[in-house]
Regions:
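Active-site core segments that coordinate phosphate-bearing ligands/cofactors
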Residues: 1-3, 7-8, 12-30, 45-47, ...
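A conserved helix-loop-beta module that forms one wall/lid of the active-site cleft
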Residues: 30-41
Length: 175
């Protein structure tokens, strides 16, 4: 049983400096390494299906499966925010502001998180647990609701149309 390094780094059991399970935390919790998955790179591929999985999916035994990474790490990669001078902001139910770095960063006040993207890069950022509420507020206060209603559209549809009309990278912003 295995887990990719980025997901492992989100568990609270991971030592970001050794990029392995943290011995002190394991000792404190009474958890052994054998109870935890092996940590692998997100690009690790495996093949092989159980007979039941093969029958249910119709996939060939040699179909490769890649471990991947957690969504926050991949969002930085997806928008090209892989350097320290580029920030990724993602908004969904929750939201986060993240920047990639070539070394782990520890916030002594524990305001920021730091997770591994892979063995050479980390993502440092701050979470917001109400990203959807922020979008709702912006749509309800910045979109002309009368105009939206006259076009038989919701304020959210209009907000998304405005966002979609801005070319990617306009003034350095990717949305």
């Amino acid at each position: 049983f295995r887990v990719d390094i980025s997901t492992a780094s989100c568990t609270g059991f991971f030592n970001m400096h050794t990029q392995d399970w943290d011995d002190e935390i394991l000792k404190l919790t009474g958890i052994t390494r054998s109870q935890l998955p092996e940590i692998v790179d997100g690009t690790t591929k495996e093949t092989g299906l159980t007979p039941a999985a093969k029958q249910a999916t119709g996939l060939d035994d040699e179909t490769p499966f890649v471990y991947g990474a957690f969504d926050g790490a991949l969002s930085n990669l997806g928008v090209g925010a892989t350097r320290q001078d580029t920030v990724a902001i993602t908004i969904g139910t929750s939201a986060a502001v993240r920047v990639a770095t070539d070394h782990p960063v520890v916030d002594p006040e524990q305001r920021l998180f730091c997770y591994s993207i892979d063995r050479q890069r980390w993502v440092v950022g701050g979470p917001l647990n109400n990203g959807g509420d922020v979008f709702q507020w912006a749509a309800n206060h910045l979109v002309d609701s009368s105009a939206a209603k006259s076009e038989d559209k919701s304020v959210y549809d209009v907000a998304n149309e405005v966002i979609a009309s801005v070319p990617a990278g306009a003034h350095g912003l990717l949305f």
